């Protein structure tokens, strides 16, 4: 699928309480709210480019995952290493702390139970466990991350070989790493639980016909104007392919 060069992947996470999760992503992770639209909240950095979306789904519509979640971990790479120290100076509740070649790194768990690793390394292998990070003086003008990307997602699947076939065809293996796990909720429809529901795949150029042909029966929907296409993987996670956007938008006219 080289004709459709991937720019980034944007996870869409279903959450029970958007406000509680919003506070976590802003305060603990230094992310910026870009757009609020109904149940959806778009998060990014100083570039105003969307990187993560939260979708509130109350308990009468969705429920807590039983067993392992589809989303094993989000790995976030930060552009300015020093800003990780600024976040650590806020004394977040970390589950792991590391020292890497470029600086510190840490892992946290969101109020919805999603694991997020924040680092600034070229190679994750450089990370070594760290007992305690030195506290630094935070500049008065630091309000959040200047730049970050979702480097990749780790996704739990019952059958990694089967799941990899689709991700290989879509050239997504660098952005979605499948991990073998067993659980009753791993193959439910994406609206049932508070979990990873959608992966938006932003493409530099979007040749919808070429992509539809390569993905075949996995394609569930193509917008009538060809502006986006929806595929479902073996875990019923939606893959939402679209061309690179000049502005943030988190919903569409069908």
Language-model features: locations:
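Hydrophobic, helix-prone linear segments
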Residues: 1-49
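Conserved small-residue-rich
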Residues: 25, 142-188
């Amino acid at each position: 699928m080289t004709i459709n060069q991937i720019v980034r992947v944007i996870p869409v996470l279903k959450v029970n309480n958007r406000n509680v999760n919003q506070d976590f992503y802003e305060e603990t992770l230094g992310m910026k709210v870009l757009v609020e639209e109904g149940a959806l909240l778009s998060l990014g950095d100083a570039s105003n480019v969307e990187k993560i979306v939260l979708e509130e789904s109350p308990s009468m519509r969705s429920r807590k995952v039983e067993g392992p979640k589809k989303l094993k971990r989000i790995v976030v790479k930060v552009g300015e290493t020093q800003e990780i120290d600024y976040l650590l100076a806020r004394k977040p509740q970390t589950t792991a702390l590391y020292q890497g070649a470029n600086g510190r790194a840490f892992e946290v768990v969101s109020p919805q139970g999603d694991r997020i690793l924040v680092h600034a390394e070229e190679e994750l292998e450089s990370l070594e466990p760290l007992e305690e990070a030195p506290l630094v003086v935070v500049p008065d003008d630091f309000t959040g991350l200047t730049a970050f990307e979702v480097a990749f997602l780790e996704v739990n699947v019952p059958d990694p070989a089967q799941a990899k076939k689709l991700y290989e065809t879509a050239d997504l293996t660098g952005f979605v790493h499948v991990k073998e796990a067993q659980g009753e909720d791993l193959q439910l429809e994406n609206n049932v639980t508070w979990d990873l529901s959608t992966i938006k795949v932003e493409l530099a150029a979007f040749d919808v016909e070429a992509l539809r042909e390569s993905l075949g029966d996995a394609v569930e929907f193509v917008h009538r104007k060809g502006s986006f296409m929806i595929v479902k993987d073996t875990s019923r996670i939606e893959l939402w392919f679209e061309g690179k956007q000049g502005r943030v938008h988190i919903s569409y006219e069908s």
